Protein backbone atom coordinates (compact mmCIF):
# COMPACT_ATOMS: atom_id res chain seq x y z
CA UNK A 1 0.00 0.00 0.00
CA UNK A 2 1.20 3.46 -0.69
CA UNK A 3 1.24 6.49 1.53
CA UNK A 4 -0.98 8.91 -0.33
CA UNK A 5 -3.82 11.08 0.85
CA UNK A 6 -6.79 8.90 1.82
CA UNK A 7 -9.84 8.71 -0.46
CA UNK A 8 -7.83 9.35 -3.61
CA UNK A 9 -9.40 7.33 -6.44
CA UNK A 10 -7.00 5.24 -8.49
CA UNK A 11 -7.50 3.21 -11.64
CA UNK A 12 -7.78 -0.56 -11.36
CA UNK A 13 -5.18 -2.67 -13.14
CA UNK A 14 -6.04 -3.01 -16.86
CA UNK A 15 -7.04 -6.69 -16.60
CA UNK A 16 -9.78 -5.93 -14.04
CA UNK A 17 -13.23 -4.61 -14.89
CA UNK A 18 -13.56 -0.83 -14.91
CA UNK A 19 -17.22 -0.71 -13.92
CA UNK A 20 -18.81 -1.00 -11.41
CA UNK A 21 -15.52 -1.66 -9.61
CA UNK A 22 -14.15 1.39 -7.87
CA UNK A 23 -10.75 1.18 -6.23
CA UNK A 24 -9.64 3.53 -3.46
CA UNK A 25 -6.49 3.48 -1.43
CA UNK A 26 -5.17 4.72 1.86
CA UNK A 27 -2.02 4.06 3.84
CA UNK A 28 -3.64 1.91 6.54
CA UNK A 29 -6.47 1.85 9.03
CA UNK A 30 -7.30 0.09 12.25
CA UNK A 31 -4.78 -2.35 13.66
CA UNK A 32 -3.56 -3.75 10.36
CA UNK A 33 -0.34 -1.80 9.94
CA UNK A 34 1.69 -4.73 8.67
CA UNK A 35 -0.42 -6.19 5.84
CA UNK A 36 -2.76 -4.89 3.15
CA UNK A 37 -6.36 -4.86 4.29
CA UNK A 38 -9.57 -4.32 2.34
CA UNK A 39 -13.07 -3.27 3.26
CA UNK A 40 -15.38 -4.30 0.44
CA UNK A 41 -18.05 -1.62 0.22
CA UNK A 42 -20.99 -1.46 0.08
CA UNK A 43 -21.05 -5.09 1.32
CA UNK A 44 -19.03 -4.31 4.45
CA UNK A 45 -16.74 -7.35 4.33
CA UNK A 46 -13.24 -7.23 5.82
CA UNK A 47 -10.30 -9.01 4.19
CA UNK A 48 -6.69 -9.18 5.35
CA UNK A 49 -3.18 -10.13 4.20
CA UNK A 50 -4.10 -9.56 0.56
CA UNK A 51 -1.94 -9.85 -2.52
CA UNK A 52 -2.87 -9.16 -6.18
CA UNK A 53 -3.94 -12.77 -6.88
CA UNK A 54 -6.27 -12.84 -3.89
CA UNK A 55 -7.71 -9.45 -4.79
CA UNK A 56 -8.48 -10.68 -8.31
CA UNK A 57 -10.16 -13.82 -6.89
CA UNK A 58 -12.35 -11.64 -4.68
CA UNK A 59 -13.38 -9.43 -7.58
CA UNK A 60 -14.18 -12.27 -9.98
CA UNK A 61 -15.33 -14.80 -7.34
CA UNK A 62 -13.83 -17.54 -9.48
CA UNK A 63 -12.05 -19.71 -6.92
CA UNK A 64 -13.46 -22.07 -4.30
CA UNK A 65 -14.22 -20.14 -1.12
CA UNK A 66 -12.09 -22.60 0.85
CA UNK A 67 -9.02 -20.96 -0.75
CA UNK A 68 -10.02 -17.61 0.78
CA UNK A 69 -10.83 -18.71 4.34
CA UNK A 70 -7.61 -17.35 5.84
CA UNK A 71 -8.14 -13.94 4.22
CA UNK A 72 -11.73 -13.35 5.35
CA UNK A 73 -12.01 -11.28 8.52
CA UNK A 74 -15.78 -10.94 8.79
CA UNK A 75 -18.82 -8.88 7.94
CA UNK A 76 -19.47 -5.49 9.55
CA UNK A 77 -23.12 -6.41 10.18
CA UNK A 78 -22.21 -8.94 12.88
CA UNK A 79 -20.43 -8.96 16.24
CA UNK A 80 -16.97 -10.45 16.64
CA UNK A 81 -18.10 -13.92 17.77
CA UNK A 82 -20.95 -14.06 15.25
CA UNK A 83 -18.38 -13.37 12.51
CA UNK A 84 -16.64 -16.66 13.32
CA UNK A 85 -19.86 -18.58 12.70
CA UNK A 86 -20.59 -16.52 9.58
CA UNK A 87 -17.23 -17.44 8.04
CA UNK A 88 -17.97 -21.14 8.58
CA UNK A 89 -21.38 -20.76 6.93
CA UNK A 90 -19.71 -19.05 3.97
CA UNK A 91 -17.45 -22.10 3.67
CA UNK A 92 -20.53 -24.37 3.58
CA UNK A 93 -22.79 -22.31 1.30
CA UNK A 94 -20.14 -20.90 -1.06
CA UNK A 95 -20.26 -17.61 -2.93
CA UNK A 96 -24.07 -17.42 -2.84
CA UNK A 97 -23.83 -16.92 0.94
CA UNK A 98 -22.55 -13.39 0.40
CA UNK A 99 -25.89 -12.37 -1.15
CA UNK A 100 -28.02 -13.86 1.65
CA UNK A 101 -29.79 -11.64 4.16
CA UNK A 102 -28.41 -12.30 7.64
CA UNK A 103 -29.07 -11.37 11.25
CA UNK A 104 -26.85 -12.42 14.12
CA UNK A 105 -27.14 -12.46 17.86
CA UNK A 106 -25.04 -13.45 20.82
CA UNK A 107 -27.16 -15.77 22.95
CA UNK A 108 -24.76 -16.14 25.89
CA UNK A 109 -21.24 -14.98 26.69
CA UNK A 110 -18.52 -15.77 29.22
CA UNK A 111 -19.37 -13.69 32.33
CA UNK A 112 -15.85 -13.99 33.76
CA UNK A 113 -14.16 -11.71 31.20
CA UNK A 114 -14.83 -8.46 29.39
CA UNK A 115 -17.05 -8.88 26.33
CA UNK A 116 -14.15 -8.39 23.88
CA UNK A 117 -11.95 -10.84 25.80
CA UNK A 118 -14.51 -13.60 26.44
CA UNK A 119 -13.31 -17.20 26.55
CA UNK A 120 -16.55 -18.40 24.96
CA UNK A 121 -19.80 -17.20 23.41
CA UNK A 122 -22.92 -18.88 22.07
CA UNK A 123 -24.14 -17.27 18.84
CA UNK A 124 -26.90 -17.59 16.26
CA UNK A 125 -27.27 -16.49 12.65
CA UNK A 126 -30.61 -16.42 10.83
CA UNK A 127 -30.40 -16.19 7.04
CA UNK A 128 -32.50 -16.09 3.88
CA UNK A 129 -31.71 -15.99 0.19
CA UNK A 130 -32.80 -12.76 -1.54
CA UNK A 131 -35.90 -14.48 -2.98
CA UNK A 132 -36.72 -16.21 0.34
CA UNK A 133 -36.49 -19.69 -1.19
CA UNK A 134 -33.64 -20.69 1.13
CA UNK A 135 -33.80 -19.76 4.79
CA UNK A 136 -32.79 -21.10 8.15
CA UNK A 137 -30.64 -20.57 11.20
CA UNK A 138 -27.50 -21.96 12.78
CA UNK A 139 -26.19 -21.79 16.32
CA UNK A 140 -22.67 -22.44 17.52
CA UNK A 141 -20.40 -22.11 20.48
CA UNK A 142 -17.23 -20.11 19.91
CA UNK A 143 -14.33 -20.95 22.26
CA UNK A 144 -10.74 -19.87 22.76
CA UNK A 145 -8.41 -22.31 21.04
CA UNK A 146 -5.11 -20.68 21.99
CA UNK A 147 -3.21 -17.43 21.69
CA UNK A 148 -0.94 -15.78 19.16
CA UNK A 149 1.76 -13.28 20.04
CA UNK A 150 1.35 -10.09 18.08
CA UNK A 151 2.80 -6.64 17.96
CA UNK A 152 -0.03 -4.12 18.38
CA UNK A 153 1.85 -1.14 17.02
CA UNK A 154 4.93 -0.38 14.99
CA UNK A 155 5.78 2.19 17.69
CA UNK A 156 6.21 -0.40 20.43
CA UNK A 157 8.12 -3.65 19.96
CA UNK A 158 6.41 -5.51 22.83
CA UNK A 159 4.43 -8.59 21.92
CA UNK A 160 1.05 -9.35 23.47
CA UNK A 161 -0.94 -12.59 23.56
CA UNK A 162 -4.16 -12.34 21.57
CA UNK A 163 -6.88 -14.97 21.91
CA UNK A 164 -7.68 -17.12 18.88
CA UNK A 165 -11.10 -18.74 18.57
CA UNK A 166 -12.60 -21.87 17.07
CA UNK A 167 -16.14 -22.92 16.31
CA UNK A 168 -17.67 -25.72 18.41
CA UNK A 169 -21.11 -27.33 18.56
CA UNK A 170 -22.37 -26.10 15.18
CA UNK A 171 -26.08 -26.90 14.79
CA UNK A 172 -28.75 -26.10 12.24
CA UNK A 173 -31.97 -25.03 13.98
Report residues per predicted region:
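Histidine/cysteine-enriched polar flanking segments
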Residues: 1-173
Amino acid sequence: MTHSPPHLPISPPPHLPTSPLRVWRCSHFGGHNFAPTLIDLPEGRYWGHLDPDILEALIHRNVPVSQLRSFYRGWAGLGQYEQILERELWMQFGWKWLSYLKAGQTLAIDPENEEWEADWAEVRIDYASPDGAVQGAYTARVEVSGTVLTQWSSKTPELAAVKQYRLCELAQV
